[in-house]
């Protein structure tokens, strides 16, 4: 039995949807990692700026992996 053109079109669209979904998941993960790195860099730059001006930065502490976290 030979598959029809409609079956072939469905398979093409289905494969395109799977490929798009896999690319989108990778892009979202990259964007999340980039946003976190930028937030950490800005927070660290803010701490360094305040320390350079002689002001206290007691509200923040550098946690594991170099991430800036609020002191408890």
From Swiss-Prot:
Recorded GO CC terms: extracellular region
Principal localisation: secreted
Leader sequence residues: 1-27
Annotated localization: Secreted
Superkingdom of this protein's organism: Eukaryota
Alphabetical keyword list: Secreted, Signal
Tissue specificity comment: Expressed by the venom gland.
Record propeptide residues: 28-45
Role played: Peptide with unknown function that does not resemble any other pilosulin-like peptide and appears to have a coiled coil structure.
Family: Belongs to the formicidae venom precursor-01 superfamily.
Name assigned to this protein: U-poneritoxin(01)-Om7a
Lineage: Eukaryota, Metazoa, Ecdysozoa, Arthropoda, Hexapoda
């Amino acid at each position: 039995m030979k598959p029809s053109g409609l079956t072939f079109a469905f398979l093409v669209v289905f494969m395109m949807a799977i490929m798009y979904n896999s690319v989108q998941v990778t892009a979202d993960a990259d964007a999340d990692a980039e946003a976190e790195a930028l937030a950490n860099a800005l927070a660290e730059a803010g701490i360094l700026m305040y320390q350079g001006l002689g002001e206290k930065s007691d509200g923040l502490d550098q946690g594991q992996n170099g991430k800036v976290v609020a002191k408890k």
